[in-house]
Amino acid sequence: MEEGGGSGVGGMQGAASNLLDAGAQAFYPAVGAPFPFQQLPHQLYCPQPPPPPYQVMPVSPPPPPVGLPVPPLPATMAPQPGYCVPAAATVVDGPASRAVVLSLVPPHAPEDEIARAMAPFGAVRAVDASAVASEGVATVYFFDLRSAEHAVTGVREQHIRQQCRLGQLYAAAAAAAASSPTWPPPAWDWPHDDNRGLVLGQAVWAHFAAASTVPDDGASRGSLVVLNSLPAMSVFELREIFQAYGDVKDVRESALRPSNKFVEFFDTRDADRALHELNGKELFGRRLVVEYTRPSLPGPRRRGHVSHQPLAPTPPRLQAAWRPAPAPSQSAQPSSSGSGKAREGVVLLRRSSGKGSSGSQSKGGGNAGHERKSKGGKSAAAACSTAASASSSTATAPSKQSQKGGGGRGGSWRGQKSGWEARFLFKEPEAAAAAAGDAAASETHEPASCKDTRTTVMIRNIPNKYSQKLLLNMLDNHCILSNQQIEASCEDEAQPFSSYDFLYLPIDFNNKCNVGYGFVNLTSPEAAVRLYKAFHKQPWEVFNSRKICQVTYARVQGLDALKEHFKNSKFPCDSDEYLPVVFSPPRDGKLLTEPVPLVGRSPAPSSASGASSPPKSCAASVDPLAQQLMTAPSSSGDGASSASSSNAHADEDDVHGETGGDRGDDAGLDLELQRLGYTD
């Protein structure tokens, strides 16, 4: 067989040619392979050497502990524009005072424990723990102002130290959990026995009490006033004299009265000792008169004015625990001032935040309430004659302002229903300013040279259970507060003090309750305006009454006219408390002149006769002369009947929510008088 020349399959004879011929040229590549196969070298397996025996490696000691300094208080940062401070973080720290408010106090902490915790900072005067159980807040009063400052600083430092200690303990616990050996306790940068500022072992927070809640009298501030010192005596000489009784904080001289000098001590006990030692003592040929200073005037001029800028940081826990206390009303201020009968804490009217408080008087006092600028060419003589007509019987048309609804304080109270004449309403600068753009209302304004001389006022909507004793107490408190503000202002020496010499509270002799209004004669027109500003449109706060007090001028003006009005009169009653009374000398709260009845008493009618003849009994149950004093509607004359008087009383009661049930509850009246301390 020839090589490569087979004619069949596998070179067998008889097979087709070029079919799967392994020797054919087509099965050989034309070009050599680019990656020729190379034989791999022989690989030997080399196992890893065995590991060395186990050895215990030494553990490096921990780094030495580093004491962390106490971080200082962050600086106060003014709020940026557009940045809203959360409501819970707006805790405002007031100016330095002797009252320190502690927050986050344990709810079971008693007063003695709180006092013991604050004793290291200074002598504690008193502790108020009434809100500890409910809010965890206590107020601590110190004798020394410096002690209060040290307490606030120490309590805050202790609070921050406790926070830093918790941070270090957390870091130590985390490091101990990451390593097996025991981690040494961290070292502190303060002694372990420093427990100052802790209440029952718990850190608290402290800030000064708000100025509105701190008493502003001289006894609480350690402030004295020397009334008749020599004008030539300098404040340095006066400081040397008072320095013998304690550290003096400040000595200053009155700008308007050089003979009056104010001395303020750090410690209230030193001020009390200096008052008792120097009052009445002769110095440089003049007897000294030393007294405590009066409370400051309300408003921005007050010494304890609270700034609305945050002064110190507030701990996060305090933001949820602290609740701002409501500001107390002015009527709740103590009003005794050397008087045993002017009782403290008897709140007769609830002051609102509007302009009706007694502290909203302008610099001009009562005269400012009657100064008007004449517009539209109205003559000053006509305006003065209209305002000064005390008992004129000529009816004056109501002003256009009262016809429109009486915006402001000078408008009509009940619109056209009451029918009060405009000449009996008080006019104030507030009403003039509100209607400055109203040409029609400007016609009723008085010129600046006109002064209202009326002094007798009518107090309306008095609760029917109100007695003459309660009304006297209310007027005494008002006079004391007004006179203290006049003395403290030192702005106008010619400003007259508030006092009154006549009082009449008409009584229904059947049920022994008042008929809803009363009359008071003040000793000056300025005092009448001050009483109007203090009580007009103020809600009463006794006997759950919903009445709103209203003050207007009375029809009969002046003490002499009132005496003539009640001349030869007798009242069918059995008590002098139901009679009109006068005071000589006038009563001002400090001088508690006893009331002297102005009229006599006749035998009281029996209940049987009253039952048999109701109309006659009704006519005799109320004094018919009382109706002639009030400012009746212009449609009725002065001689109104007793029946219309009774209807007027009922109308006032119905309008303000008082019904007949308010009058007949004698048991409730006795309980209220007993609660206020007027009865045993």
Curated annotation (Swiss-Prot):
Residues 404-413 have a biased composition (Gly residues). Pfam families: RRM_1, RRM_2. SUPFAM superfamilies: RNA-binding domain, RBD. Highly expressed in shoot apex and inflorescence apex, at intermediate levels in roots and at low levels in leaf blade and leaf sheath. Residues 328-340, 379-403, 602-621, 634-648 have a biased composition (Low complexity). Gene3D superfamilies: 3.30.70.330. Disruption phenotype: Plants produce threefold the number of leaves, and leaf size and plant height are strongly reduced compared to wild-type. Shoot apical meristem (SAM) shows a higher rate of cell division and internode elongation is significantly reduced. Some inflorescence branches are converted into vegetative shoots. Residues 294-415, 593-680 are annotated as: Disordered. Residues 656-666 have a biased composition (Basic and acidic residues). Residues 223-295 form the RRM domain. The keyword RNA-binding applies. One of its GO terms (molecular function) is RNA binding. Keywords: Developmental protein, Repeat, RNA-binding. It comes from the Eukaryota. Plastochron is defined as the time interval between leaf initiation events. Probable RNA-binding protein. Involved in the regular timing (plastochron) of lateral organs formation. May regulate the rate of leaf initiation and the duration of vegetative phase. Seems to be redundant to the function of PLASTOCHRON1, but to act in an independent pathway. This is Protein terminal ear1 homolog. It comes from Oryza sativa subsp. indica. The lineage of its organism: Eukaryota, Viridiplantae, Streptophyta, Embryophyta, Tracheophyta.
